[in-house]
Amino acid sequence: MGAKQMKCLSSSSPSHTPKEEYIIAKSEDSGELVGNHTEQPQSLEDVVKSSATDPYPGPEHVVKEESSTWEEQLCAQQEQLEKEMQETRKMVSRLQALLLHGSLPEDEQTSTLSFGDTASSEQQLILTRSRLDQSMEESLDLKRELLRYKQEARNLQAVKDALQQRMSVQEDSVLQLKQELLRSSMTREELEGQNVELERKLSERNRLLSEYKKELGQKDRLLQQQQTKLDDALRRISESYHRLSGCENNGYSHMMDTSSAVFQHRMGDELQLVRDALRSLRDSFSGHDPQHHTLDTLEQGVASLVDRLHTSDTKKRPERKGSTRSPGRKANHTDRESWPSTSKIAHSHSSPVLSAAASTKVLYYTDRSLTPFLVNIPKRLGDVTLQDFKAAVDRHGSFRYHFKSLDPEFGTVKEEVFQDDAVIPGWEGKIVAWVEEDHGEGR
């Protein structure tokens, strides 16, 4: 009988139905105490019998409660159910302790159940099997929870890896943005520095421009002064020419020759004055100033004007001599023709008035102007020396002189001449030269 009762207790699981929990709770309220395993089934039967009548009140109690409202009934029932639930939980915990340890929690301090003395080996086996089943179920539950936790851990690890990957991508993006920001800041600083440099250069250019404007105004005033001097010189030349024409018309040939010589001398002085003015004006400009071309053109115009005046005077003089010569002086005709003509008088280097009978054209270039200059030297080609060329060019300072010539071995070359008495080589009946400033470099 005791074995069957123990088997019934061991087969019951820790989880009970609500009806059994209610029965167990009522049995505790009735004051029954479970003392040993043999009396446990009898107490359960008594609880079942008593529970068949206790939960439901009699007719008298129903009549008494008819006077209360349904709300109070619900509140009372709810409180009663809560109490029953608490008692049921306590009973379940006691039953679990009884199945596992063989005694109730309140009996642990007073007495301990020993199945080695009172129970048989079959009961111990049943108890061990029940404990083993419970342990296996708990192990299975733990394994399921472990698998669930592992799956959650794997999911969390995957989420973590994805988040780390996204974080690395975001960090790369942030690093790239920082690099772009650094480059943009460096570019901005560089542009700011360039702007400052450009502003400084602009202010410097503005300052230079204002200075150049001042210098240009001064040079314009100087040019006007030189132009005034040139106009005065040309006017004096014209007046001298008119006076010379008046002297030639009075019939005195001796005074005509004297006036012609005086005219040539004065004309040379006036031209020298003009050339000095142009030289001082040229020195006031820079090396590559475009005003040099204007001054060169002006100088060539004045020289050609004086040359035309001299040519016309040379042509008119024989006619006037023939018209004014008296018959009594025809005997001296041979003597007069043997006199040297004024057109063959050697001129100073300050005058470009040259003889057309025995002269050599000289075309020379300078490093200050792209336009070549043309002068005449009153000597035949082959007799012109470097001294004659310097006198014709009439430029102050240290220069180097190169002349175009034909070399038997190399063909057309530029030949530099150093000595003043050296003969200048020619090219196709004229002299082509280049005049360059000597800056002291070694030759």
Swiss-Prot record:
PROSITE patterns: DIX. It is found in: Cell junction, Focal adhesion; Cytoplasm. Residues 339-349 have a biased composition (Polar residues). Residues 309-322 have a biased composition (Basic and acidic residues). Functions as a positive effector of the Wnt signaling pathway regulating antero-posterior neural patterning. The DIX domain mediates self-interaction and interaction with dishevelled and axin1. Homomers. Interacts with dishevelled and axin1. This is Dixin-A. It comes from Danio rerio (Zebrafish). The lineage of its organism: Eukaryota, Metazoa, Chordata, Craniata, Vertebrata. The gene is dixdc1a.
